[in-house]
Protein backbone atom coordinates (compact mmCIF):
# COMPACT_ATOMS: atom_id res chain seq x y z
CA UNK A 1 0.00 0.00 0.00
CA UNK A 2 1.44 3.41 -0.88
CA UNK A 3 2.09 5.76 2.05
CA UNK A 4 0.39 9.17 2.12
CA UNK A 5 0.35 11.85 4.78
CA UNK A 6 -1.16 15.26 5.48
CA UNK A 7 1.65 17.76 4.91
CA UNK A 8 -0.22 20.89 6.10
CA UNK A 9 -1.31 20.00 9.63
CA UNK A 10 -2.44 22.65 12.11
CA UNK A 11 0.24 23.77 14.58
CA UNK A 12 1.12 21.15 17.17
CA UNK A 13 -0.31 18.16 15.31
CA UNK A 14 1.80 15.14 14.42
CA UNK A 15 1.16 11.49 13.67
CA UNK A 16 0.58 9.19 16.63
CA UNK A 17 2.38 6.20 15.13
CA UNK A 18 1.05 3.89 17.87
CA UNK A 19 -2.44 4.37 16.38
CA UNK A 20 -1.52 3.69 12.72
CA UNK A 21 -3.50 0.91 11.08
CA UNK A 22 -2.11 -0.53 7.85
CA UNK A 23 -3.22 -3.51 5.82
CA UNK A 24 -3.02 -4.60 2.21
CA UNK A 25 -5.99 -2.41 1.20
CA UNK A 26 -6.39 0.19 3.98
CA UNK A 27 -4.38 2.75 5.97
CA UNK A 28 -5.65 4.75 8.94
CA UNK A 29 -3.54 7.51 10.49
CA UNK A 30 -4.31 9.47 13.65
CA UNK A 31 -2.77 12.88 14.28
CA UNK A 32 -2.63 14.30 17.82
CA UNK A 33 -1.89 17.80 19.04
CA UNK A 34 1.24 17.59 21.20
CA UNK A 35 0.80 21.22 22.33
CA UNK A 36 -2.81 20.67 23.44
CA UNK A 37 -3.27 17.00 24.42
CA UNK A 38 -7.04 17.46 24.94
CA UNK A 39 -7.56 18.78 21.40
CA UNK A 40 -9.58 16.43 19.17
CA UNK A 41 -7.54 14.18 16.86
CA UNK A 42 -7.42 14.42 13.08
CA UNK A 43 -7.87 11.20 11.08
CA UNK A 44 -6.64 10.39 7.58
CA UNK A 45 -7.92 7.17 6.05
CA UNK A 46 -7.47 5.77 2.58
CA UNK A 47 -8.54 2.55 0.96
CA UNK A 48 -8.10 0.82 -2.37
CA UNK A 49 -11.36 0.90 -4.29
CA UNK A 50 -12.22 -2.58 -5.46
CA UNK A 51 -15.27 -4.73 -5.97
CA UNK A 52 -16.99 -5.19 -2.64
CA UNK A 53 -15.49 -2.06 -1.04
CA UNK A 54 -17.99 -0.07 0.99
CA UNK A 55 -17.50 3.41 2.45
CA UNK A 56 -19.96 4.28 5.21
CA UNK A 57 -20.57 7.89 6.28
CA UNK A 58 -23.16 8.92 8.88
CA UNK A 59 -24.99 11.97 7.53
CA UNK A 60 -27.81 12.46 10.06
CA UNK A 61 -26.60 15.81 11.37
CA UNK A 62 -24.47 17.01 8.47
CA UNK A 63 -24.75 19.31 5.50
CA UNK A 64 -23.35 17.60 2.38
CA UNK A 65 -21.78 19.41 -0.55
CA UNK A 66 -19.83 18.45 -3.65
CA UNK A 67 -16.19 19.44 -3.50
CA UNK A 68 -13.04 19.21 -5.59
CA UNK A 69 -9.67 18.28 -4.08
CA UNK A 70 -6.75 18.87 -6.45
CA UNK A 71 -9.03 18.22 -9.43
CA UNK A 72 -10.61 15.09 -7.91
CA UNK A 73 -14.30 14.94 -7.05
CA UNK A 74 -15.50 14.34 -3.54
CA UNK A 75 -17.90 15.34 -0.79
CA UNK A 76 -17.71 17.56 2.24
CA UNK A 77 -19.81 16.61 5.27
CA UNK A 78 -20.13 19.58 7.63
CA UNK A 79 -21.40 18.67 11.07
CA UNK A 80 -24.27 20.75 12.39
CA UNK A 81 -22.78 20.30 15.89
CA UNK A 82 -19.02 19.80 16.03
CA UNK A 83 -19.20 19.08 19.76
CA UNK A 84 -20.82 15.78 18.76
CA UNK A 85 -19.18 14.85 15.45
CA UNK A 86 -16.34 15.75 13.11
CA UNK A 87 -16.43 17.39 9.73
CA UNK A 88 -15.41 14.96 7.00
CA UNK A 89 -14.03 15.37 3.51
CA UNK A 90 -13.78 12.44 1.10
CA UNK A 91 -12.43 12.25 -2.42
CA UNK A 92 -11.48 9.60 -4.97
CA UNK A 93 -8.20 9.42 -6.86
CA UNK A 94 -9.36 7.48 -9.92
CA UNK A 95 -5.84 7.34 -11.38
CA UNK A 96 -4.57 5.34 -8.37
CA UNK A 97 -7.93 3.77 -7.45
CA UNK A 98 -7.89 5.17 -3.90
CA UNK A 99 -10.55 6.81 -1.75
CA UNK A 100 -9.33 9.26 0.89
CA UNK A 101 -11.10 10.78 3.88
CA UNK A 102 -10.13 13.24 6.59
CA UNK A 103 -12.17 13.62 9.77
CA UNK A 104 -11.52 16.63 11.99
CA UNK A 105 -13.23 19.18 14.20
CA UNK A 106 -11.95 22.01 12.05
CA UNK A 107 -13.51 24.57 9.71
CA UNK A 108 -14.42 23.89 6.09
CA UNK A 109 -11.43 25.88 4.83
CA UNK A 110 -9.00 24.14 7.21
CA UNK A 111 -10.14 20.62 6.32
CA UNK A 112 -10.04 21.44 2.58
CA UNK A 113 -6.52 22.88 2.98
CA UNK A 114 -5.40 19.65 4.69
CA UNK A 115 -7.01 17.52 1.97
CA UNK A 116 -5.20 19.47 -0.73
CA UNK A 117 -1.91 18.86 1.11
CA UNK A 118 -2.17 15.05 1.20
CA UNK A 119 0.95 13.79 -0.52
CA UNK A 120 2.59 10.50 -1.42
CA UNK A 121 5.61 9.88 0.80
CA UNK A 122 6.40 6.30 -0.22
CA UNK A 123 5.23 4.41 -3.28
CA UNK A 124 4.34 0.73 -3.31
CA UNK A 125 7.29 -1.44 -4.25
Question: Whereabouts are the PLM-identified features?
Answer:
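Surface-exposed amphipathic alpha-helical segments
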Residues: 95-125
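Short, solvent-exposed recognition patches
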Residues: 1-95
Amino acid sequence: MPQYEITALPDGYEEDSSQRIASVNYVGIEYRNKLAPDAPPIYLDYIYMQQGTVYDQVTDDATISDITVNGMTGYLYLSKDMSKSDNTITWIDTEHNLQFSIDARLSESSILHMAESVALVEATK
